[in-house]
């Protein structure tokens, strides 16, 4: 059952000791995705969560992490504008994998925001950035605070976009550690994992959607388009969640 984030017990200690980041990166660069997950869980017991948009290939990270810790909080940011297929996909995977789903939502509903600000996603780059800040960045920040998370897993991959090619397996942002267990996986690696474990792609994947976010800012991949152009009218690739949180 989906819940609002519930507070966890916090065990204060340094996120990473001085000079530890470089050695951890070297250690995990040669490790498997499963070993990277185990490192994160061991290094931050009770203080690490998994973020998921329940996008095209989300089942990989959800399965990979929860097979090691079934009750890890899984944070979904619900903007109120997800595809109907996404909500059903959330329900399907939550039931199948027994997820400890924690749903983070904006301070104001979609209808309230439209009444107050209009359709921000139609107001150019500035409007899109404001929309993403209110509906994605701020809810995620609040969820991490509420859950007492010093670290979080994310399913980013370098192959997904030019903006992700310099991402590291472990990063520090805003005094929190981000762990990317499948950062160096290819599309073929993802497909093999899904096939091996009989896991589904997002339903819209089979209709030509390769990157799936909100209804109003997601398009099918067409001939001549890059994956980046399927989001936010090609004005930007990232929603800001992985840059600002």
Swiss-Prot record:
Gene Ontology molecular function: phosphoadenylyl-sulfate reductase (thioredoxin) activity
EC number: 1.8.4.8
Catalysed reaction equations from the record: [thioredoxin]-disulfide + sulfite + adenosine 3',5'-bisphosphate + 2 H(+) = [thioredoxin]-dithiol + 3'-phosphoadenylyl sulfate
A GO term from the CC aspect: cytoplasm
CDD domains membership: PAPS_reductase (cd23945)
Localization per record: Cytoplasm
Protein keywords: Cytoplasm, Oxidoreductase
Keyword Cytoplasm: yes
Record-linked PANTHER family: PHOSPHOADENOSINE PHOSPHOSULFATE REDUCTASE
Function of the protein: Catalyzes the formation of sulfite from phosphoadenosine 5'-phosphosulfate (PAPS) using thioredoxin as an electron donor.
Name used for this protein in its record: Phosphoadenosine 5'-phosphosulfate reductase
Organism: Alkalilimnicola ehrlichii (strain ATCC BAA-1101 / DSM 17681 / MLHE-1)
Lineage: Bacteria, Pseudomonadati, Pseudomonadota, Gammaproteobacteria, Chromatiales
Gene that this sequence comes from: cysH
